[in-house]
């Protein structure tokens, strides 16, 4: 009987085909669409509604990859902030350096920076990347009223970080603290905007939620002029709207949008998240649904 040698396909299946030197090797990475990377530098929120947690949810919803550097660990929920542990500046710097060493960061968002040494460390790191869009949310006080920035750090924030901002996103109380002018008085609005722009950012998105009236008016200003966003005031207060707005804005800047277009998309995103908001809490603040 004549013996026949069996082929690999008749034994354990065909061997994998090895490309010859002449045949092109498939480039797997070239088939994967690039995802913009955004770095958020902010405090954590144990309740998940604001801070780093809100930023990362927003980044995912906006289709970008989120990285983070935590500046402070807070014990908080929708009722308030019960504890704040500020990380040493060297630990914040180490996180930022680790991200930049490995990821092609396309935009940066800053939130709660907590202390003057942390602000200096962040500003020093950002100066090494002058072309990066930077969204500065000047977090001073939590929605519940807790102070989130040391009293001696405000001047450092103004002098060292605001000149690096592509877009500055203060609410009215924050704008008043930064300019020394009553930002809730509509007669002062133009003067407040001018003072904020003089601090160095390329653009300002002033959040009007703390003003009185049935409508909320947010205003965007840059060298090309002003743009106003008007929406109906919703009942009650929400948690994490400022963080979410700044994070959405940074995500759109990372995609290459202009600051004006990014602001328009970010405001619309927050309004949708508010409309879908839910009450997974015993406290009095609404949580956004991303």
Question: Positions of the model-derived regions?
Answer:
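Intrinsically disordered, low-complexity proline-rich regions
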Residues: 14, 19-21, 28-31
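Nucleotide and nucleotide-moiety/phosphate-recognizing core
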Residues: 106, 116-131, 191, 202, ...
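Short, small-residue alpha-helix embedded
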Residues: 58, 176-177, 236-259
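Conserved phosphate/ATP/ADP-binding segment of small-molecule kinases
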Residues: 151-226
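Charged C-terminal helix
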Residues: 2-4, 35, 86, 102, ...
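Conserved N-terminal subdomain of the carbohydrate kinase-like
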Residues: 29-40, 52, 56-143
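Short pre-catalytic strand/loop immediately N-terminal to key active-site residues, enriched for Gly-Thr
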Residues: 41-47, 226-239
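Phosphate-handling active-site elements
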Residues: 62-67, 227, 252-266
